[in-house]
Curated annotation (Swiss-Prot):
Keyword terms, alphabetized: Decarboxylase, Lyase, Magnesium, Metal-binding, Phosphoprotein, Thiamine pyrophosphate
Cofactors, names only: a metal cation; thiamine diphosphate
Lineage of source species: Eukaryota, Fungi, Dikarya, Ascomycota, Taphrinomycotina
Entry's EC annotation: 4.1.1.1
Transmembrane segments: none
Name recorded for this polypeptide: Probable pyruvate decarboxylase Pdc101
Binding site for Mg(2+): 446, 473, 475
GO MF, any single term: thiamine pyrophosphate binding
Residues annotated for substrate binding in this entry: 33, 120, 479
PANTHER family, sorted: PYRUVATE DECARBOXYLASE (PTHR43452), PYRUVATE DECARBOXYLASE C186.09-RELATED (PTHR43452:SF1)
Organism listed in the record: Schizosaccharomyces pombe (strain 972 / ATCC 24843) (Fission yeast)
Modified sites of kind Phosphoserine: 233, 522
Family: Belongs to the TPP enzyme family.
Length: 569
């Protein structure tokens, strides 16, 4: 081997090596002529396997599901017709704080200034529109125009994804993947974490501890950014140090153990997990947030918006305390050091324990009675153990899922900031690819499923035993509760038959119908025996059968949506 050969590799191989080095074993793809050469380099790189997807939206959602389990993911699509579709799912990854590396092929560099019109474009000579969009939806976007620039640009994008917990975009022209570039340096330069500024960390924890010492009823609140910050264990340490009541936001379910002695429920305003949870939270004199995020959904149409004068919050890289903001203070380090500086503040935990809500176990329905939502959830609850990951689709599945009891080790996945119906099925596929040893269960409605259900095809292809409970109530239930109209009624499908229709000649998917509790029990037994592919159980329930929480929440959100314009807006 010559000296030059030892110091160079191709751009495609460079990207493949970096993906493997950061822990990616599978990349999700939809092929197109602008990315085919790149896909060859990725496919044949040791330790990296391709997962084909049915379309680019599903590809992006599958990658974000993989990132939920693996910590980071990669999706590869073609230019314009592929990437513009994928951007929807990448927007979700941005909103949900998930590092997904979106790689798009692009036209041959010789055509960019040639005056040629190219396919898969707008039919103009503007080839920058995709990059302009990508910059709005990612924390870093790079286009490799020269092979010698590839290492720095690829490393920069990957590092930003890791540091900012957001998606990034890498554009590689079709004639660039096979071009030589320098070999990579140590991966530590890309993945090494940043640490807090020591002086800022000390000052922030001192002021926070002093503020807490002056309060009688502080509480802790875990938010949706807690997991991405890697601060779950630090949150537990602070809960134990303060010995106060510790709550979670709905999008943080599963990030803090429901079996922990300080756990006090899901706070969600008037649709909180219990009246006791709501009362204790709202009587507190200081909310200590860890990665909290307040929007119109999480505040029930702004009715549960926090009082900023009593909110202390730690974000990824900053801490805000009434009257102060500290930059370069990382969440996990802040919570851990703060735990060493505070004393016990048990008033809120004592108040919660005095009126602790009793666990109500629903009675089994009559075996031959018409199936209803409560019976479906009762039987799903019986499947949830420490090895379960439960997906709750946007809609009433949110509220059904939040009522589930999670034992230690169980995980829960929602998409509450982006709120894209249809997200759960492709995301669960990606999750199951990353964590095949776990039991992945999906709760999804009929309307949501119709957007992305064909991704069951990849569950069949890769023999992923995902268990899908499809609640068929013949419409967009969440939209009905927010604002009803004929547009919320959909064409009914035979969803169980649809699932099996994707088997082809060799697939092992099972599609089953359940119209009674007895039939659901039998269907679950069949599902648990099917280890070679997914099982979809179509649960027929009444159109109006939904949680009261969805009804109440829907009215509040509808009211917020209907506010008339004001003079200042």
């Amino acid at each position: 081997m010559t000296k030059d050969a030892e110091s160079t590799m191709t751009v495609g191989t460079y990207l493949a090596q970096r993906l493997v080095e950061i822990g990616i074993k599978n990349h999700f793809v939809v092929p197109g002529d602008y990315n085919l050469r790149l896909l060859d380099f990725l496919e044949y790189y040791p330790g990296l396997s391709e997962i084909g997807c049915c379309n680019e939206l599903n590809c992006a959602f599958a990658a974000e599901g993989y990132a939920r389990s693996n910590g980071i993911a990669c999706a590869v699509v073609t230019y314009s017709v592929g990437a513009l579709t994928a951007f929807d799912g990448i927007g979700g990854a941005y909103a949900e704080n998930l590092p997904v590396i979106l790689v798009s092929g692009s036209p041959n560099t010789n055509d960019l200034s040639s005056g040629h019109l190219l396919h898969h474009t707008l039919g103009t000579h503007d080839f920058e529109y995709q990059m302009e969009i990508a910059k709005k939806l990612t924390c870093a976007a790079v286009a490799i125009k020269r092979a010698e620039d590839a290492p720095v640009m690829i490393d920069h994008a990957i590092r930003q994804a890791i540091l900012q917990h957001k998606p990034v975009y890498i554009e590689i022209p079709t004639n660039m993947a096979n071009q030589p570039c320098p070999v990579p340096g140590p991966i530590s330069a890309v993945i090494s974490p940043e640490i807090s500024d020591k002086e800022s960390l000390e000052k922030a924890t001192d002021i926070a501890a002093e503020l807490i010492s002056k309060k009688e009823k502080p509480i802790l609140l875990a938010g949706p950014k807690l997991r991405a910050a890697g601060a779950e264990s630090a949150f537990v340490k602070l809960a134990e140090a303060l010995n106060c009541a510790a709550f979670i936001m709905p999008a943080a379910k599963g990030f803090y153990s429901e079996e922990h002695k300080n756990y006090a429920g899901v706070y969600w305003g008037e649709v909180s997990s219990s009246e006791t949870t709501k009362a204790v939270y709202e009587s507190s004199d200081l909310v200590i947030g860890a990665g909290v995020l307040f929007n119109d959904y999480s505040t029930v149409g702004w009715r549960a918006a926090p009082n900023p004068n009593i909110l202390l919050n730690s974000d990824y890289t900053s801490v805000s305390i009434p009257g102060y903001v500290f930059s370069r203070v990382y969440m996990a380090e802040f919570l851990e050091l703060l735990a060493k500086k505070v004393s016990k503040k048990p008033a809120t935990l004592e108040a919660y324990n005095k009126a602790r809500p009793q666990t109500v176990v629903p009675k089994a329905a009559e075996p031959k009675a018409a199936l209803n939502r409560v019976e479906v959830m009762r039987q799903i609850q019986g499947l949830v153990d420490s090895n379960t990951t439960l997906y709750a689709e946007t809609g009433d599945s949110w509220f059904n899922g939040l009522q589930m009891k999670l034992p230690a080790g169980a995980k829960f996945e929602v998409e509450m900031q982006w709120g894209h119906i249809g997200w759960s099925v492709p995301s669960a596929m990606g999750y199951a690819v990353a964590a095949p040893e776990r039991r992945t269960i999906v709760m999804v409605g009929d309307g949501s499923f119709q957007l992305t259900g064909q991704e069951i095809s990849q569950m069949i292809r890769h023999k992923l035993p995902v268990l899908i409970f499809l609640l068929n109530n013949r419409g967009y239930t969440i939209e009905i509760q927010i604002h009803d109209g004929p547009y919320n009624r959909i064409q009914n499908w035979d969803f169980a038959a649809f699932c099996e229709s994707l088997n082809g000649e060799t697939g092992k998917a099972k599609g089953l119908h359940a119209k009674t509790g007895e039939e659901l029990t039998s269907a679950i037994k069949v599902a648990l025996q099917n280890k070679e592919g997914p099982t979809l159980i179509e649960c027929a329930i009444d159109t109006d059968d939904c949680t009261q929480e969805l009804v109440d929440w829907g009215k509040a959100v509808a009211s917020a949506n209907a506010r008339p314009p004001t003079a200042d807006n």
